[in-house]
């Protein structure tokens, strides 16, 4: 089967936003206008086409990024709907990795919100070009200029409108295209009838002023345009479009559009802009991987059908009808169903059974998938998120993804023996799907402990165990993932010497421990000179330290952000062994615990609370009573916003508390920010509790 759409006419885009900015509704409308669905489903009635897991439909939030293929104006658009709830940032990270561009959806009343900041940061890390869609222009309190202002103030983004909305709230009914200087007026409720006219006299001065600002902003990052602009030359529509496209693809400029997905206005123009300004797979930097057998040999995966096949698996899902589905993005070459591929990451050969192109929750079987496309494979047994699939003769490993460690843990107990087996199966499958979900058995208590990115994350996973895997389980109280670190530097000795007839054990190390910068992790330096410890034992010293650090020195929590410099020691020709040096290193760490002032660290959450002004005093008092630090306050429309850092340990059950404190009128969102030292009195309680006192 020949390729239906050229690479130049392919767009892989994500739709990202804060929870409730209207992201799923926007995607729904895209599918409606591109002819993918015939009836519009509303998120708040639980009928949305993209939200296909039962829980998503109940909660009205998107959890997994479903990948959908749509067509618009002779282009293929692969859309990945990403979750806006902060507990699901891994889903966002995963989808950003395989996108070429994104549409950031903002709520016209709130502008940039905390989760928008998080997702924006992630998109910047991956260098993803973006356009911004300011949604909900029909909402009471909608303010286009305020929202654009938040892009500048909170994200320092070079973002400028390429449209001017006419009217706001219930008066919003038309949009001026500032590039072409045309007025688009909506004449029916479904948004399918649009009248295109010249910009009327009463709006002309405003539109021209905004167009001037737009040209100036683009000229700042485009020399050719700058010369013309300064020379007072006329800039044609095509020149302006080309300059906006260039600046957007280079991630130097973000076009801003307006609309209301719910009321069907502005979505088609946003689709036009996605095609006009977001890159095709040919416009983004080619992905650089390395040879499977040599990390130093770079291999470029070119977006070309005739190149060797290379793809990245970015999501694994268990589907009730076909079993395990592996979503992947093809970076180079083509793949036919029924063929064999190499999983270079795992070093295993896999057979691709069927290839499906997904449409939210319905699917279409295809025989070939081409370079630059996104599809799902059935039949891959060993492939997990972040693995590279490639041609057996041309093996390459594409860069994989980094996933954050869980910040919250719960114990789960199956209710019966039958549930025990089902639960083991469920945990394996859920971990395959979600790399930020961890499960292990506590060696001391025998309990199964699950870890994730927040309360909602774990709630949903436990709920999925019940629904999809029919596991009845009792869930314990949440536990915080504390960490430990050193505050002082000290040089210590760790010596292990055992003589008990026959061959003994001997290892002796001198190590200087010192605090590392926050987030710096563990750094090991080998400063041995003159062979006082033979080279072959050095890795054992590092391994011994790493193992011992896992269990900490105070209360059994992992020790982080520490530097260790091995500078002296001694060995015995006969009695020294790798094991002896491992033990010596762990003894040195025990010794360091006495001298390096170890402390316990706790996860601090960046919290934003929005509520009516009359509750401000109560909320501020409540934040302070939870050991929170208020970082700032501002008015947003007729509501007040409090931004604070609060320890995760104090935030359990906060949703219920906030509801009762504000009669259900307050909302909050939180995201993990950093680790901070726990106050002495609380640290003592944690240590006592962990020692069973």
Curated annotation (Swiss-Prot):
One annotated Gene Ontology cellular component of this protein: cytoplasm
Source organism superkingdom: Bacteria
Keyword Cytoplasm set for record: yes
Signal peptide location: none
Primary location recorded for the protein, binned into one broad class: cytoplasm
InterPro entries on file: EFG_II, EFG_III, EFG_III/V, EFG_IV, EFG_V, EFG_V-like, EFTu-like_2, G_TR_CS
Xref: CDD domains: EF-G, EFG_III, EFG_mtEFG1_IV, EFG_mtEFG_C, EFG_mtEFG_II
Protein residues bound to GTP: 17-24, 81-85, 135-138
Molecular function (Gene Ontology), one example: GTP binding
UniProt keyword Thylakoid, yes or no: no
Cross-referenced SMART domains: EFG_C, EFG_IV
Swiss-Prot/TrEMBL keywords: Cytoplasm, Elongation factor, GTP-binding, Nucleotide-binding, Protein biosynthesis
Residue ranges of domain tr-type G in the record: 8-282
Compartments (UniProt record): Cytoplasm
UniProt record, GO biological process: ribosome disassembly
Role, per record: Catalyzes the GTP-dependent ribosomal translocation step during translation elongation. During this step, the ribosome changes from the pre-translocational (PRE) to the post-translocational (POST) state as the newly formed A-site-bound peptidyl-tRNA and P-site-bound deacylated tRNA move to the P and E sites, respectively. Catalyzes the coordinated movement of the two tRNA molecules, the mRNA and conformational changes in the ribosome.
Family the UniProt entry places it in: Belongs to the TRAFAC class translation factor GTPase superfamily. Classic translation factor GTPase family. EF-G/EF-2 subfamily.
Protein name, as recorded: Elongation factor G
Native species: Macrococcus caseolyticus (strain JCSC5402)
């Amino acid at each position: 089967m020949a390729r239906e759409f050229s690479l130049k006419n392919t767009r892989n885009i994500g739709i990202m936003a804060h929870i409730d900015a209207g992201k799923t509704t926007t995607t729904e409308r895209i599918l409606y206008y591109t002819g993918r669905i015939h009836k519009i489903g509303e998120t708040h009635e639980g009928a949305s086409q993209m939200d296909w897991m039962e829980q998503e439909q109940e909660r009205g939030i998107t959890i997994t990024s479903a990948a959908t293929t749509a067509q618009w104006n002779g282009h293929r658009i692969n859309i990945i709907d990403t979750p806006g709830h902060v507990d699901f940032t891994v889903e966002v990270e995963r989808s950003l990795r395989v996108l070429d561009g994104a549409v950031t959806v903002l709520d016209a009343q709130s502008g940039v919100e905390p989760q928008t900041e998080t997702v924006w940061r992630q998109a910047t890390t991956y260098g993803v070009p973006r356009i911004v869609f300011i949604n909900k222009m029909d909402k009471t309190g909608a303010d286009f200029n305020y929202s654009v202002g938040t892009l500048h103030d909170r994200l320092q983004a070079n973002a400028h409108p390429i449209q001017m909305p006419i009217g706001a709230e219930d008066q919003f009914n038309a949009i001026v295209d500032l590039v072409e200087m045309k007025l688009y007026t909506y004449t029916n409720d479904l948004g399918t009838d649009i009248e295109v006219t010249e910009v009327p006299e009463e709006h002309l001065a405003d539109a021209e002023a905004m167009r001037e600002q737009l040209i100036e902003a683009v000229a700042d990052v485009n020399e050719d345009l700058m010369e013309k602009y300064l020379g007072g030359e006329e800039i044609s529509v095509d020149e302006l479009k080309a300059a906006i496209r260039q600046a957007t693809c280079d991630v130097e400029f973000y076009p801003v559009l307006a609309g209301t997905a719910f009321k069907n206005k502005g979505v088609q123009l946003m689709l036009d802009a996605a095609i006009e300004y977001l890159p095709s797979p040919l416009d983004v930097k080619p992905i650089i991987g390395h040879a499977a057998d040599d990390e130093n040999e770079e291999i470029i995966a070119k977006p070309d059908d005739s190149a060797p096949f290379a793809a990245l698996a970015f999501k694994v899902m268990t589907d009730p009808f076909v079993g395990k589905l592996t979503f992947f993005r093809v970076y180079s070459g083509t793949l036919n169903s029924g063929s064999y591929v190499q999983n270079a990451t795992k070093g295993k050969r896999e057979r691709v059974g069927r290839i499906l192109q997904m449409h939210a929750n319905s699917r279409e079987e295809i025989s070939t998938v081409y370079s630059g496309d996104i599809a799902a494979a059935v039949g891959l047994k060993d492939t997990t998120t972040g693995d590279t699939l490639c041609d057996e003769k041309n093996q390459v490993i594409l860069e994989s993804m980094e996933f954050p460690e869980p910040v919250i843990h719960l114990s789960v107990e199956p209710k019966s023996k039958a549930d025990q087996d089902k639960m083991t199966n469920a945990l394996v499958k859920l971990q395959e799907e979600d790399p930020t979900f961890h499960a292990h058995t506590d060696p001391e208590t025998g309990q199964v402990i699950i870890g994730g990115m927040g309360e909602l994350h774990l709630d949903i996973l436990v709920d999925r165990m019940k629904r999809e895997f029919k596991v009845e389980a009792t869930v314990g109280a949440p536990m915080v993932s504390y960490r430990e670190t050193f505050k002082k530097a000290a040089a210590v000795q760790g010596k292990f010497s055992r003589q008990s007839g026959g061959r003994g054990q001997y290892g002796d190390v001198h190590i200087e421990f010192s605090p590392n910068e926050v987030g710096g992790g563990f750094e090991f330096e080998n400063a041995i000179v003159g062979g006082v410890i033979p080279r072959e034992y050095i890795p054992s010293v590092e391994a011994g330290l790493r193992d011992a650090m896992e269990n900490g020195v105070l209360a059994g929590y992992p020790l982080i952000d520490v530097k260790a410099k091995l500078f002296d020691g001694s060995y015995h020709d006969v009695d020294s062994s790798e094991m002896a040096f491992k033990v010596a290193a762990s003894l040195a760490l025990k010794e360091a615990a006495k001298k390096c002032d170890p402390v316990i660290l706790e996860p601090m959450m960046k919290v934003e609370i929005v509520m009516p002004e009359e509750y401000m005093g109560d909320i501020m008092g409540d934040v302070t009573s939870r050991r929170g630090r208020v970082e700032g306050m501002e008015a947003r429309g007729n509501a007040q916003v409090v931004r604070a850092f609060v320890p995760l340990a104090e935030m359990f059950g906060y949703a219920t508390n906030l509801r009762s404190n504000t009669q259900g009128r307050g909302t909050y969102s939180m995201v993990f920010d950093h680790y901070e030292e726990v106050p002495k009195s609380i640290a003592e309680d944690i240590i006592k509790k962990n020692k069973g006192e």
